Amino acid sequence: MEVCLPNGHQIVDWINNAFEGRVSIYSAQQGWDKTISAQPDMMVCGGAVVCMHCLGVVGSLQRKLKHLPHHKCNQQLRQQDYVDVQFADRVTAHWKRGMLSFVSQMHAIMNDVTPEELERVRTDGGSLAELNWLQVDPGSMFRSIHSSWTDPLQVVEDLDTQLDRYWTALNLMIDSSDLVPNFMMRDPSHAFNGVKLEGEARQTQFSRTFDSRSNLEWGVMIYDYSELERDPLKGRAYRKEVVTPARDFGHFGLSHYSRATTPILGKMPAVFSGMLTGNCKMYPFIKGTAKLRTVKKLVDAVNHTWGSEKIRYALGPGGMTGWYNRTMQQAPIVLTPAALTMFPDMTKFGDLQYPIMIGDPAVLG
């Protein structure tokens, strides 16, 4: 059968779903089970099922496909053309499982706090609840330099529901107690620059997620890797060291109504932009332009393998390149949540070297 390209809005959904770890993937070896990494034969792209050998639409979610349908396939796409999308999806899926371990254990610790302990911290200051992230999930793929993004995913039932439930309950506990956590913060205007993945996706080895400054990476609000030097293999420049609000702004503050998460897993800054409603979900906040960079190689590949008429029909004037450039310009608006741009009334922070904790703002500073 003849196939067509997915539409532009479906590709946008695909990118967004990749950074939520929610892309459905089919492989001949594993079927629709993505817990074991395998080369995809099909992916779900905005409600359409697309062939990953040509990016043609071969079906929809209304019909559960059990094999790759026979179709007129140009077989010009290679895994390296879309591996960035696959990488973002799988790393985020690993990240969410790690964050579930973290928030569930912090929630359990907070549940054990007695009214007497809470009153003592309110009166005298100090830490009320403390958690060493490095002991939370010893089996996490992020614990070892030898781990790979292709490592098997832990099977978790209703992952998103559990994350939302624990995260919401933890927020309510913190807010109702007027406490300050050191793993939450608000987006200070446009200071956050999304995410730049360290290393190309096809490099299967993660660089170590924590080093001699492990507390800084795991217990602090890290939000960016700044550009510094150009790497010809990556095509753009990177600064290898992390950037923190304290480093960028000097002393940086935090209040009990700030929102975001650490620890940072797999070099993916998990920063939550404040929604206009004040509500924050358990997903990494990643700038739209960073999301779009994940499909740059795919854009180039599709331009070479599809006729300009079909591309123009699916994506409008200018084809893939035109769609890519237009969406890049709109990305901060159409692909990211609205950000609150006010600084809260903040507690001052210095080097932020202490572990993940919840306590009194007068002492945490």
From Swiss-Prot:
GO molecular function: protein serine/threonine kinase inhibitor activity; RNA binding; structural molecule activity; zinc ion binding
First and last residues of each zinc finger (CCHC-type): 51-73
Cellular component terms (Gene Ontology): host cell cytoplasm; host cell nucleus; viral outer capsid
Single Gene Ontology BP annotation: symbiont-mediated suppression of host type I interferon-mediated signaling pathway
UniProt keyword Phosphoprotein present: no
Alphabetic keyword roster: Capsid protein, Host cytoplasm, Host nucleus, Host-virus interaction, Inhibition of host innate immune response by virus, Inhibition of host interferon signaling pathway by virus, Inhibition of host PKR by virus, Interferon antiviral system evasion, Metal-binding, Outer capsid protein, RNA-binding, Transcription, Transcription regulation, Translation regulation, Viral immunoevasion, Virion, Zinc, Zinc-finger
Pfam families, sorted: Reovirus_cap (PF00979)
Post-translational modification: Cleaved during virus the endosomal proteolytic disassembly of the outer capsid.
Subcellular location: Virion; Host cytoplasm; Host nucleus
Similarity comment text for this entry: Belongs to the orthoreovirus sigma-3 protein family.
Role: Stimulates translation by blocking the activation of the dsRNA-dependent protein kinase EIF2AK2/PKR, thereby inhibiting the host interferon response. Sigma3 prevents the activation of EIF2AK2 by competing with the kinase for dsRNA-binding. The viral outer shell polypeptides, of which sigma-3 is one, impose structural constraints that prevent elongation of nascent transcripts by the RNA-dependent RNA polymerase lambda-3.
Quaternary structure, from the entry: Heterohexamer of three sigma-3 and three Mu-1 proteins. The RNA-binding form is probably a homodimer.
This protein's name: Outer capsid protein sigma-3
Encoding gene, per UniProt annotation: S4
